[in-house]
Amino acid sequence: MRAELNQGLIDFLKASPTPFHATASLARRLEAAGYRRLDERDAWHTEAGGRYYVTRNDSSLIAIRLGRRSPLESGFRLVGAHTDSPCLRVKPNPEIARNGFLQLGVEVYGGALFAPWFDRDLSLAGRVTFRANGKLESRLVDFRKAIAVIPNLAIHLNRAANEGWPINAQNELPPIIAQLAPGEAADFRLLLDEQLLREHGITADVVLDYELSFYDTQSAAVIGLNDEFIAGARLDNLLSCHAGLEALLNAEGDENCILVCTDHEEVGSCSHCGADGPFLEQVLRRLLPEGDAFSRAIQRSLLVSADNAHGVHPNYADRHDANHGPALNGGPVIKINSNQRYATNSETAGFFRHLCQDSEVPVQSFVTRSDMGCGSTIGPITASQVGVRTVDIGLPTFAMHSIRELAGSHDLAHLVKVLGAFYASSELP
């Protein structure tokens, strides 16, 4: 069970270098399990016991498993996660020709750790919009092979490199993708033309625009002397997306279950497909009668907001409160912040702790040091947007926002088990 779940996560990470690809991967799994796609532009005809999913912007997804009881009686059991991760995104006019090399200008998306991006075998993926035969179309592309690198400057030329050398994103992060012959010009859009033909058999009249991100081609892996860890890119937060999907597809019971995987969390969630937009509320309203049905159903509902937590790093243990240091493989972490950076309260935390105990899953607590600031999640955003009671949780992780993060290999099974128990729970607090 644990090995199978971990391998499934590794496969999901490999297939999901961008939020667009992650959403497509989730949709494929749902369709294989009998879920039917709903188009927001059409009238919906849903029924008790139905299985559905909705996407928006190709980068956010809501999966719906309706029970036999009306949400007005039993509410919704919601699990929330996000599909995006910090990365380097290609600029609109990216070509940089310097000293015989072709580089691409990049914009930093989210709060990325810069240093780990150096000396990696990078590829490129995302969404391309183009015109073909006079028709406007979009397709996902993934170069898959390593096409770029950001080489470090040798220590001989930068003696202060190990003394906290600041990295300038504008000047030092553009990846090298090719050498140029003297006088040779480069057009990045021609490369995208070739990729569309190679990957989709489409000859584009013109590439109009794109949303493309570099990513590390090194596959995720189970590592450690005793296989204790999972190392890989985008664990924050595709790990939670994968856990939520596994729990949804395998949960027992007959409740109204929702999985929400939204884009743009790393940049504030303020978009038409992000948690700070209307996506979730609009979908839920379409599952309910008009009038006060939404307010009544949402007050019977609960959201588990799942986003990775900071595990105690042995080299930096003093960065944690001494009594609230989550351990890798120690189970899910309940995140608490009195200033509402997390939406957890005593009632929702107590309920989640109860689920863990009933499921024989270890559970931990996280509170940031009182002299340090605290990050946030989609939990408070969704709670304030929709009015749903929320508990913020996540699996402990090292190197969050690095190009390669680290989590415990036992924890995915822990999270899937307790989320399955949540989806199956007949009573909410």
From Swiss-Prot:
Alphabetical UniProt keywords: Aminopeptidase, Hydrolase, Metal-binding, Metalloprotease, Protease, Zinc
Residues given in the record as Zn(2+) binding sites: 82, 156, 401
Listed cofactors: Zn(2+)
Gene Ontology molecular-function annotations: aminopeptidase activity; metallopeptidase activity; zinc ion binding
Entry GO terms, CC: cytoplasm
GO term, biological process aspect, one: proteolysis
Annotated EC: 3.4.11.-
Entries under CDD domains matching the protein: M18 (cd05639)
Family label: Belongs to the peptidase M18 family.
UniProt name for this protein: Probable M18 family aminopeptidase 2
Organism classification: Bacteria, Pseudomonadati, Pseudomonadota, Gammaproteobacteria, Pseudomonadales
